[in-house]
Swiss-Prot record:
This is Large ribosomal subunit protein uL4. One of its GO terms (cellular component) is ribosome. One of the primary rRNA binding proteins, this protein initially binds near the 5'-end of the 23S rRNA. It is important during the early stages of 50S assembly. It makes multiple contacts with different domains of the 23S rRNA in the assembled 50S subunit and ribosome. It holds the Pfam family Ribosomal_L4. The gene is rplD. Belongs to the universal ribosomal protein uL4 family. Keywords: Ribonucleoprotein, Ribosomal protein, RNA-binding, rRNA-binding. PANTHER family: 50S RIBOSOMAL PROTEIN L4 (PTHR10746), LARGE RIBOSOMAL SUBUNIT PROTEIN UL4M (PTHR10746:SF6). One of its GO terms (molecular function) is rRNA binding. Residues 46-71 are annotated as: Disordered. It comes from Shewanella woodyi (strain ATCC 51908 / MS32). One of its GO terms (biological process) is translation.
Length: 201
């Protein structure tokens, strides 16, 4: 199959398996959920009454004080006491094998092509790290909400895009399922397309 280059009167020959396969919604959903889960820290932790530092002594005698009976200062109803059902650190990570991950990326790229959301250009960059220059260049192409994918991170392009809302720059190694579906359009250079094909096999 062929992808038409937006900035040139030519087309790029690409693999049907990478850019023309059926959309596997269940697989993409599973990989996106796993990717988000793997980003979680899971380090929250609270102390139970057994873990709170403090004496085990009964604060006052059982009868005769007029106060409510109390057996510990570490109970959940006391200020500074333990938490009844204390949260503990958890590992939220989900295993996704390479075949599934690559399959999800292929599904996403194929769907982007079908929806005309994948824009392929011969090359893309800015001469200086100026937000104004990049904004004007994107406006010419009628692009606002866009992920720009290049073979390697162009520092000028990265710095120019850093202050633009809903514009991000990634190299091929830095793309992931969440970022690909988070933007309205994905702008990819021809060299990046070749790298993506090599990466996804």
């Amino acid at each position: 199959m062929e992808l038409v280059l937006k900035d040139a009167q030519s087309a790029l020959e690409v693999s049907e398996t990478t850019f023309g396969r059926d959309f596997n919604e269940a697989l993409v959903h599973q990989v996106v959920v796993a990717y988000a889960a793997n980003a979680r820290q899971g380090t929250r932790a609270q102390k139970t009454r057994a873990e709170v530092v403090g004496s085990g002594k009964k604060p006052w005698r059982q009868k005769g004080t007029g106060r409510a009976r109390a057996g510990t200062v570490k109970g959940p109803i006391w200020r500074g006491g333990g938490v009844t059902f204390a949260a503990k650190a958890q590992d939220h990570s989900q295993k996704v094998n390479k075949k599934m991950y690559r399959g999800a990326l292929k599904s996403i790229f194929s769907e982007l092509v079908r929806q005309d959301r994948l824009i392929v250009v011969e090359s893309f960059g800015v001469e200086a790290p100026k937000t104004k220059e990049l904004k004007a260049k994107l406006a010419e192409m009628n692009l606002e909400d866009v992920l720009i994918v290049t073979p390697e991170i162009d520092e000028n392009l990265f710095l120019a895009a850093r202050n633009l809302y809903k514009v991000d720059v990634r190299d091929v190694a830095g793309i992931d399922p969440v970022s690909l579906i988070a933007f309205n359009k994905v702008l990819v250079t021809a060299d990046a397309v070749k790298q993506i094909e090599e990466m996804l096999g």
